[in-house]
């Protein structure tokens, strides 16, 4: 293996500088100092791979650095990092045991040795990229000394490179690689045939030239004999001398052409030998690829088998998950059964308490109806008494007016005040009586004795379920009835209070209007009497007429007010009638609800008696004959237990089978990976042989990188 340490670093730097000049970049690159700022290197890298080293990366390299060595070092660090990342990410290689260039020495002192190492890394990127054939051809066109140094640097760099990773599944690309190799082999064979044809043509040309040469030699000999016989050929003026010069020049031309054809023949022979070697190498590679293809096919079959087994494993896992869900549902059902049993006992206790409350509510409902009737009677009596009181007040005031006419106005105000006070007191009495009635209606009645609890007697689940349903139904009906009764009672109470209040107001206004009307009528009567008594007096007639007109106006105003009050009363009467109709409808609905409650209570009592009779008949001696439903429930529980145990056994079996299949898959995958890794290592060792040419090793390295894109990382790369 070559070692670049035998070559002077200065010579390496100069040779690589000559190679850099072949890229024709914009920046000057005549001396080593021109490369220390990193601008030329960045432009060269962009030409090598413009996709990876794009304009964004190039813009990070500062062009105007001048003599600032810090900016130079910054540019060189960016370039070195880009080269290493390109080798790792794009080329899939990692440089080991290679001394990286010291960018500080390059930037500060323009060190040629470190600059040569940097250019050597750029050279490695060029000969390993996708356009490597161009750059290798450019190297071949350079001088032999420069070419030798560059080739030595390439081989040293290649000896330090190692692939980052090799693929465990390389057999995926073997078919494609085999087709490509077959195409290259066919191209090489066609090129060989063309070269052989060309060699044959050149041999024919050489034979023809040799025959021509022999004929010319014979002719020359004849001419020499003639020359000896004739004049001296040294005289150029003589015809023989001129002919001699002409033949001599023609002979020299033929000799040069012969030498040129022989050199071309040797070159073609060497090229033919190289192509034969390449054909043999390609055949060997073809054989290796066919073996790899067979191995890949066998591995594909194994993978199909493993995939089928993995599908079975996934199905079994799905079944196990469904069994787990069923087991969880079974546990939930058991917990629900326990909760329902607890609720059953609680509902039975609530049933007894609700029966007691129902009895109390029935008793309170009867008392409430009696109180309502008493309230209506008292209101009627109150209205009658108020009318009588109004009449008595009116008579009292009339007599008092006759006695004392001067204090008429004062007495009238006093009577009005007294009447208002009486009305307020009456209203207060009515409100106090109504409040007392409502409080008496809502007072709790005496509690009765609770019925016997049946929690200890209920045994079977069906009886418990029936009782639970009945209790829930009873509870919902009671709640609905209580809510509806409370709402209706509150609504009726509010409507009744509003109606009573409005009625009292209207009665008060009506009473006042009647009093005013009676007063006006009495005044009219008095005026008429006084007019009849004093009809003879002419001077008082005008005054009497005025008084009469005033009293008539007052009477008219009172009649108008009375008509307005009557209209208001007539407007309010339909509302009062509607509210009374609504109250009657609500009372009728309440009565229907009470009848429904009675029916529900009767049904509940029947069900309760039936449950008690069933419980009494459940004697322990007759359980087997009289309780087939209990036996059916027991059978169902036993069947569920058996199903549970069978599911557990099947789950354990599938779990052990899945564990074994996972172990088999892991072992097969490990063996396949080891085989491919060993094969890749042998290929790499075979590709580094010293007997092959540089171009052959380059092709093998490229095919290895394409075939094994990478999962296994060698120990040197770690």
Curated annotation (Swiss-Prot):
The modification N-acetylmethionine is found at residue 1. Residues 687-706 have a biased composition (Polar residues). The modification Phosphoserine is found at residues 6, 238, 693, 707. Residues 682-718 are annotated as: Disordered. Belongs to the hook family. Self-associates. Component of the FTS/Hook/FHIP complex (FHF complex), composed of AKTIP/FTS, FHIP1B, and one or more members of the Hook family of proteins HOOK1, HOOK2, and HOOK3. May interact directly with AKTIP/FTS, HOOK1 and HOOK2. Associates with several subunits of the homotypic vesicular sorting complex (the HOPS complex) including VPS16 and VPS41; these interactions may be indirect. Interacts with IIGP1. Interacts with MSR1, and this association is stimulated by ligand binding to MSR1. Interacts with microtubules. (Microbial infection) Interacts with Salmonella typhimurium spiC. This is Protein Hook homolog 3.
């Amino acid at each position: 293996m070559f070692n670049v340490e035998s070559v002077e670093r200065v010579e390496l730097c100069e040779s690589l500088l000559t190679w850099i000049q072949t890229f024709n970049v914009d920046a000057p690159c005549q001396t080593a100092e021109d490369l220390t700022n990193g601008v030329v290197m960045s432009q060269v890298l962009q030409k090598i791979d413009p996709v990876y080293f794009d304009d964004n990366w190039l813009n990070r390299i500062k062009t105007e650095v001048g003599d600032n060595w810090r900016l130079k070092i910054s540019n060189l660090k960016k370039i070195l990092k880009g080269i290493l990342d390109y080798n790792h990410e794009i080329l899939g290689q990692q440089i080991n045991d290679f001394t990286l260039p010291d960018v500080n020495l390059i930037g500060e002192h323009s060190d040629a040795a470190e600059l040569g190492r940097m250019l050597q890394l750029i050279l490695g990127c060029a000969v390993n990229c996708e356009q490597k054939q161009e750059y290798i051809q450019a190297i071949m066109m350079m001088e032999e000394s420069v070419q030798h140094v560059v080739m030595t640097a390439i081989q040293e760099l290649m000896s330090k490179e190692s692939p980052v990773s090799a693929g465990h599944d390389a057999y995926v690309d073997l078919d494609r690689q085999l087709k490509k190799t077959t195409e290259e082999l066919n191209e090489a064979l066609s090129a060989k045939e063309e070269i052989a044809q060309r060699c044959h043509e050149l041999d024919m040309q050489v034979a023809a030239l040799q025959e021509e040469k022999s004929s010319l030699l014979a002719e020359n000999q004849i001419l020499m004999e003639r020359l000896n016989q004739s004049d001296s050929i040294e005289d150029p003026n003589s015809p023989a001398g001129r002919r001699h010069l002409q033949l001599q020049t023609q002979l020299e031309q033929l000799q040069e052409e012969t030498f040129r054809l022989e050199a071309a023949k040797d070159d073609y022979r060497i090229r033919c030998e190289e192509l034969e070697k390449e054909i043999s190498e390609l055949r060997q590679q073809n054989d290796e690829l066919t073996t790899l293809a067979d191995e890949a096919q066998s591995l594909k079959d194994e993978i199909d088998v493993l995939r089928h087994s993995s599908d079975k494993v996934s199905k079994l896992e799905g079944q196990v998950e469904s069994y787990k869900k069923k087991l969880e549902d079974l546990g939930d059902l058991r917990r629900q059964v326990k909760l329902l049993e607890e609720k059953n006992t609680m509902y039975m206790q609530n049933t007894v308490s609700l029966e007691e409350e129902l009895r109390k509510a029935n008793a309170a409902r009867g008392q409430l109806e009696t109180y309502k009737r008493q309230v209506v009677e008292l209101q009627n009596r109150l209205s009658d008494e108020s009318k009588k009181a109004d009449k008595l007040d009116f008579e009292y005031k009339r007599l008092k007016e006759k006695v004392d006419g001067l204090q008429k106005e004062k007495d009238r105000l006093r009577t009005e005040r007294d009447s208002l006070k009486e009305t307020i007191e009456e209203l207060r009495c009515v409100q106090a009586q109504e409040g007392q009635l409502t409080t008496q209606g809502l007072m709790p009645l005496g509690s009765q004795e609770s019925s016997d609890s049946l929690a200890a007697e209920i045994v079977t689940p069906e009886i418990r379920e029936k009782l639970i349903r009945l209790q829930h139904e009873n509870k919902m009906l009671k709640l609905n009835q209580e809510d509806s009764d409370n709402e209706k009672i509150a609504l009726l109470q509010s409507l009744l209070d509003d109606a009573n209040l409005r009625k009292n107001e209207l009665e008060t206004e009506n009473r006042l209007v009647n009093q005013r009307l009676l007063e006006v009528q009495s005044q009219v009567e008095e005026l008429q009497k006084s007019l009849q008594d004093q009809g003879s007096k002419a001077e008082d007639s005008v005054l009497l007429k005025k008084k009469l007109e005033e009293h008539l106006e007052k009477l008219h105003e009172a009649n108008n007010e009375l008509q307005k009050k009557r209209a208001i009363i007539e407007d309010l009467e339909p509302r009062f009638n509607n509210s009374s109709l609504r109250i009657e409808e609500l009372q009728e609905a309440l009565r229907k609800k009470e009848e429904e409650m009675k029916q529900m209570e009767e049904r509940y009592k029947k069900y309760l008696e039936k449950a008690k009779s069933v419980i009494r008949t459940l004697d322990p001696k007759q359980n087997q004959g009289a309780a087939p439903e209990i036996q059916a429930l027991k059978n169902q529980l036993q069947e569920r237990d058996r199903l549970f145990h069978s599911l557990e056994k099947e789950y354990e079996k599938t779990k052990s089978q899945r564990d074994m299949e996972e172990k088999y898959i892991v072992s097969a995958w490990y063996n396949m990976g080891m085989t491919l890794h060993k094969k890749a290592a042998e290929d790499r060792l075979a590709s580094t042989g010293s007997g092959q040419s540089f171009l052959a090793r380059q092709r093998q390295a490229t095919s290895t990188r394409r075939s094994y894109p990478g999962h296994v990382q060698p120990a040197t790369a770690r």
